[in-house]
Amino acid sequence: MPATLYDLIPRDEKPGNDVLLGRFLDYVAGRRLQLYPAQESAILELFEEKNVILNTPTGSGKSLVATALHFQAIAQGRRSIYTCPIKALVNEKFMALCREFGPDNVGLSTGDASVNREAPLLCCTAEILANIALREGAQANVQEVVMDEFHYYADRERGVAWQVPLLTLPQARFLLMSATLGDTTFFEGELTRLNGRPTVAVSSTARPVPLEHAYSELPLAKTLESLAAEGKAPVYVVHFTQLEAAQSAQDFTSINVCTREEKAALAGALEGFKFSSPYGPDIKKWLRHGIGLHHAGLLPKYRVLIEQLAQKGLLKIICGTDTLGVGINVPIRTVLFTRLCKYDGQKTGILSARDFHQIAGRAGRKGFDDRGWVVAQAPEYVIENLKLAEKSARDGKKTVKRQPPEKNFVNWDKSTFTRLIAAPPERLASRFQVTHGMLLNVLSRKGDGCRAMQQLIARCHETPRQKQTHIKRAWQLFCSLLDRKIVEFIEPRRSRREEVHSEMQSAECEARNESEIVVRLHPDPLPQEREQQGVAAGLPEASELASARKQILPLPGGEGRGEGERKLRVNIELQEDFSMDQALSLYLLDTIPLVDPQQPDYALILLTLVESILEDPDIILRKQLDQVKDRKMAEMKMEGLDYDQRMEELEKLEYPKPNQEFIYSTFNAFADRHPWVGQENIRPKSIAREMFESFRSFSDYIRDYELQRAEGVLLRHLNRVYKVLAQNVPDAAKNDQIREMELYLGSMIRQVDSSLLDEWEKMRNPNFQRAETKEVRPPGAEEAALDITRDTKAFTATIRNRIFVFLRGLVIADYEAALGSLSEGRVPRAPETDSVTQSQGLAELVPPKDADGQPWTADRLRATMEAYELKHERICLDPNARNARHTYVTPSDDQKSWRVQQMLVDPEEDNDWLAEFEVDLVQSRALGEPFLRLRRIGSLV
C-alpha cells in the first residue's frame, strides 16, 4: 500500500475523475474503512464536479470527504483551500494533510503563522480566505474551497468571513460542511448562482455512534463518580465561563477516577513537557489526576497537550468551555452540561438548538465507543432543594428552600432538555458588515475596485434596507480613507483636447441640472463638506458609493483605463505589511502625528495609543482595578476616613489609563470628522506599557496580578499589541525605543509559547513518518530550548529589560528583588515534585558573585547604593535612561559570553557610574532566557 495519498496520483498524465475516484476508493479500502452512505454520496457528487453542502452529524467522516476533494484538486493541478474558524484546528489539519500530501504541497496561514503559503493546498482560517477573496476576487488562484464548521456563517462578529467567498469567487467550487446547518435551500441556490455549477445537499441525521440522553438531579461530583464507575468516561464537563471550568478541575481532584497504572501512564506522557508558565504546575497537577482543562484562556501549548492526551485516552475528565465543542477531534464518551443557559454577549438565555447539538455531538466517537451519552445537570438550587427535602423528610423539620440566582441565569428543567434534543438547528442568518479592511482589500484590486465593492454589497445575503445601510457605511469609510490619504487619486497627464472634452462634459451636465457627477480630469478631491452633504441629504437613485465611483471611473465610451484617466490606488508608501484589520486603525494613523517625537515619553504614548484601539481584556483590567482599590483603601485607612467615605472614594477609581485626556480629546475630534466611528469606542489602558515601564516578564505580570487562569488572555493581548506596532504604525513614526518595544514583545511571545514552524521543519525531513508510527509531539515536549541568542537584537532587548529589573530593585531599595533578577540569584520555590524551577535547572543555584568571587548580598547592594547616593540624587529609569546608547555589549573572544556595561544615568547627567554584567550564552541557550552575572557596580574611574 502506498505510504500517502500523494503517492496515488498518476504522474504520467493528467488523470480523469473516474481514475482518481477509483484510486481514492482503493485508498479507503486499503485503510480498512467503510464509507457511510452520506460520505459515499458526497464523494461521488464531488467527482461529478458539483458543489456539495454536507450536513451530517459530528463523527460521520466529513474530513474524509474534504480529503477526497483535495486529492482530486492536487491530481488535476487545481488549488484547494481548507478553512475553519479555530486556529488550533487549522494547525491540526495542516499537520494531517502534510502527512498525506507531503509538506511541500501543503501550506498554512492563520494570522499567527504562515508556512508555504503558495502551496497547492492551503490550510487557513476563514478570515484569511476572505481577505484573499476580497483582494483578488475572480482572479484569485483558488479553484476548490472547503469551508468547515460553516455554521459560523451566523456568528455575529466573524460570520462575514464565511459569506465573502460565496460572493466573490465564481471560479471556485465549494464544499460546505457542518453538523448543524439547518435548512440549506438558500445556500444551494446561491452557490449555483455564483459559479454556475449544480449544488447538491447531502444530509443525514444518522450518527455512526448513537447517543443516549439523561437528566441528572444528583450533585455534580456524584454524577461524575457514577459515570466513571459505569465506564462512561472520558467525560467532557461543559461550563460557560473559564473560572467555573478551572474551579471544577480543582474540585474534581477529590474524585479518584484513575487507577495507579493509568496515573503512571500519564506521568510518562508528561515527561519532558515544560510547564514553564505560572499556571503550569496547576495544570500538571490536574493532569496527573486524569483531569484536563480546556478553554481559550490557556496558553495554546497546554490546549494542544490536553487534546493529545485525550486522543490517547489518558484523561478521564475534561473541564472546559464550549470551545471544545467546535471542531477539535478529541474522543469524548460523555458530554455533561453543567447548565443549559448561556450568556451570548448580549443577554443570558437558554442554549440555542445549534449550540446544544454542536456540543452534544462531541459525545461518542467512531472507533472508540459503541454509543455516547449526553447528560444535563439540573440547576444547582433545584439539586440543593431536593437534598433539603430528603433531609426534612428524614428529620421531620421544615427547611427554607433555595431560590434561583437573580443574575446571569435563566431557569431550565427536564422538559427544556427534551425540547433541545428534538429541536433542529436554527436557520443561518447573514452577518455581513462593511469594514475598513474590507474596503482596502477590494480597492487594492488591479481592476475597478469601486465597481467590485458595489457588486459585493449588491450580492450580499442581506435585505434591501440592510444593503442601503452598508452602502452608506462604505461611503463614509471611503471618504475617511481618502481624507487620510490611505487611498488616493493618481492624476494623469492630460492633453489639451482632454481638458476641453472634460470642460464640455461639465457644462453639459450643469445645463441638464443632473445630480450625477461625471468624472473630472482636473484635480477634484472629495472635501469634507461633500461627505457631510451627501450623507445628510441622500443622493438620488445612484447611491452615495456609486457617486464616489463615478469620480474614479474613466470617461464614458472608453474601454478600460487609458493614459488620460484618473485612477484610484491604495497608498503604496505605507510599509508593505501595513494593516487596517483593527476597526480604529485610522484613528491611530490620524493621531500619531499629533505626538511630538521629541517628547521623552513619545514611545510610551504611542504604545498607549496602540493599546487603546484594541479590545479590552476585561479580566486583566479588573485585576488592575482591584490593586488600585487595595492601595487606595490602605491609604484611606491610614488617613482615618470612615467606611462610607472610603466606599464613595472607591467608586470613583478606574484601572490605569495613561494619557487619557489626550486620547479622549483626540478621539472625540476624530469622531466628529468621521460619523462611522460612532459604532466604535476608544479604550485607553496600560498592560503592555505597564510591563515595559516596570521591566516585568510575562511570568512576573501573571504572578503580580494573579492571572494564572488567564495566561492565554494576556498572551493574545500582547500578540495583538505586537502586531499593531509592527503592521499599523508607520515606519517613519518609529524611533529606537519603539523598535526595542517590538523586539521586547516579540521575544517574550516566542519564549512563552511557540514552535509550529519547528514542527513543520521536522516534517520536511525526508525520513518523517506518519502519525500511526511516529507521533508529532506537542509544542514544548521532547524539544531542546529555542536558541534565544540567535536573534541578536531581540536577545539584547531581553537582556536590557532584565538589567532594568535589577536597577529598579536598587531604586526602590528592594535589594532582595534586585538579587532575584540575577540568574545566579534566582530564589527557587519550595521543593515540590512538579517544580517548574527544577525542570529549568535553577533549583541548585549558588548565591551571585562578583568578578572577584565575592558574594552579592542585600547588605552589600545597600552599601553600594549609599555610596552612589553620596554623589548623585538617584538612578534614573526614564525613557532617556533606557536609551540603547547607554548600553555597551562586548562579545568574548571565544563567543561563549558577552560583557554588558550599563551606564547608570543620573539627574545631573554626570553618568559616571556603571553596572557591569556577564551574559553566559551557553547557559542562556539551555534555559531559554538570558543568564546574567553581576560583575561590578561602581565608578567609571
Locate the predicted segments by residue:
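Conserved segment of the helicase C-terminal RecA-like domain
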Residues: C341, S352-E390
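Non-catalytic terminal extensions of ATP-dependent helicases
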Residues: G292, K312, P404-V518, Q528, ...
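A short beta-strand element within the Helicase C-terminal
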Residues: I317, L324-C341, G372-V375
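Conserved two-lobed SF2 helicase motor
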Residues: E118-A133, H289-P300, A310-N329
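Conserved P-loop/Walker A NTP-binding site and adjacent catalytic elements of P-loop NTPases
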Residues: L25, L33-P208, S216, P234-H239, ...
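Conserved interdomain hinge at the start of the Helicase C-terminal
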Residues: S216-F240, Q247, V304-K312
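Helicase-associated low-complexity/disordered flanking segments
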Residues: M1-L44, E48-V52, R260-R288
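Conserved C-terminal RecA-like helicase domain
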Residues: I81-T83, N91, C98-G107, Q242-I317, ...
